[in-house]
Amino acid sequence: MITVATAECFTLGKIGTTIHKIASGYEECKNHRYYNIINGNVKIISSSFIPSIEGAEKLLNLGAPLPKCDYEYSYSKAYTEKNDLKVAHILAKGLKNSLNCNIAIATTAGVGRGGICIISDKNEYLFTTDIEGDLISKKNIIQRQKNGIDKTINKFVEILKKEYFL
């Protein structure tokens, strides 16, 4: 069984929840296009929505502080796209190290296309959504979120097929 954990910000834990529902055989997911790949082969060991620096540092035992935010925004992380990519990588690495899972997925997005990182047992994948968004002005954040969820799940399944031969 392939173990998976997520630390999500702009995707609000929906990647982990979706994978969990498919893996667990929820009735509403039995017609999902990836059901036959995920169900019976994958289990979510942790799925987290972590919007704050404080939460990420404490929960993931990162060993070093995350970068200071590029933008002032309530209590949530808000970075440029370049730093979103760095932070997503740090979060995924912390998650993988803390939980010793096969696949760690992390997402974060402030201003830009956001940052998504998937770390498997063999490789690290760092990418963005296809949608420019701005957490501060709330521009395109729902569209960016939906695109990020879909793109990440598609990449996750691609990794399962390529690296785990499913």
From Swiss-Prot:
InterPro entries: HcgF (IPR009625). Belongs to the UPF0254 family. This is UPF0254 protein Maeo_0668. It comes from Methanococcus aeolicus (strain ATCC BAA-1280 / DSM 17508 / OCM 812 / Nankai-3).
